[in-house]
Amino acid sequence: MTSKSKSQLLALSLVCGALLLTSRAAMAQVEFVGVNAKATLTDNNTVATVTGSIVCGPGDTFQINSVIQQNHAQTNVAGSGNTEPVACTGSPQPFAVQVQVVNPPNATFQKGPASAIVSAFTGPSDDSQTLTVKLLLSE
């Protein structure tokens, strides 16, 4: 084997090794597949369920947090909620977050447009991703 061939083989080996390490690191990350644009109202319009799907690497767990803000009748209504931790599989997994109205007290969501911040967190890899989405709240 010539010196040039050895150099090319070494370079190819380094590139393959870097790709392998990069793909393993990517598996530890959390990524939204999507967040549904429609959220369902329940519990006398005090809860909106935000749904979607996520991918994260095996060996991790994920948790989803969401905050919804809606302006109606000159009132700014806000709610928050989170899921329990779920084991990651490496494949797309559905989630549903029940977002409860928290402010003002005794307020309700109304059918119509709203904004949401949806965040995914994984452990033990300690990765996260956050999306801001427009929602349509409906019964």
Model feature map: region roles:
Residues 30-31, 41-49, 82-83, 90, ...:
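Short boundary segments that mark the start of a structured unit
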